[in-house]
Amino acid sequence: MKTNMLTNNCKDKIFIKKSHTILRLLYFFKSLAMILFFIFFSLTSYAKPKIVVSITPISSILAMLVKDKVDIESLAVNNECPHHHNIKPSDITKVRNADMVIYINEQFDGFTEKLISNNNQNIIKISDIKSLTTIKNNWHIWLDLNNAKILLQEFAQIFIKNFPQLQKEINNNLPIALKELNKLQDIKNNEFRTIKDIILLSDSSEYFFLNTNIKTAKLYRESQKSLRYISKLEELIKGSNNKCIVLSNKQKSQLYTKLNAKTKIIILNSENWNVKNINSNTFQDQYLQMINQVKKCIH
């Protein structure tokens, strides 16, 4: 009888031990599950949105608004006209992994439309923003600082709606960014105050001279080598005060070296910007470079 009692007692102790072990294991797995849940929640909550933008000037305006809270990648990273961008395999990967894609329209950066045709991301088409000042068949809109301000304000609304976790950051950055653009406008007006007129040979520069007191003559031609074209250009230079012609960086300045010796040839970086690491100062830096390029018309 004593033996049976001892046996039962041992069984009870073993059962209790097993129960405690099971409870400990359950508690361990419950704690582990909670830890993994919080890690996953933290990673998903604080993961930066991935935004793909067709060209660097638009990327740089966006960076003023979101700074380092968003991963921004540009597709066309060069000084060339976006019309001629050749799609690369890396572009396809960028778009596929993006939370949002921003481009201008099929006419300007149409390569982006090909990339987004089979994707379901949020697509922002800038030409749909009706408050922008636009020139027919010309979409270098960022060179007009008033347009840059409109883009900042439109992007602010879009990003707060799609990424509400960025609202505080955007609300803090927007007024600062608008002030920076106002400063650029003041610098531009001050530096250009003695420039009376210029001659534009590329429509890509046209937006840059909106809202200034500079009179602009425009001579846009596909072929810039004909005698008629050169004759017309010489006539415009003769009647000009500053005798300053403005080309885009895709045009060949060598064609104009035999013009009037007093003619100043300005090559303006107006097509796109070859900047790989976009940050919140990129737009101001690039725009100031363009102001300094045009200042050569004075001397």
From Swiss-Prot:
It comes from the Bacteria. Pfam families: ZnuA. GO terms for biological process: metal ion transport. It is a single-pass membrane protein. GO terms for molecular function: metal ion binding. The keyword Electron transport does not apply. GO terms for cellular component: membrane. Its main location: membrane. Keywords: Membrane, Transmembrane, Transmembrane helix. CDD domains: TroA_c. The keyword Transmembrane applies. The chain crosses the membrane at residues 25-45. PANTHER family: HIGH-AFFINITY ZINC UPTAKE SYSTEM PROTEIN ZNUA-RELATED. This is Uncharacterized protein RP014. It comes from Rickettsia prowazekii (strain Madrid E).
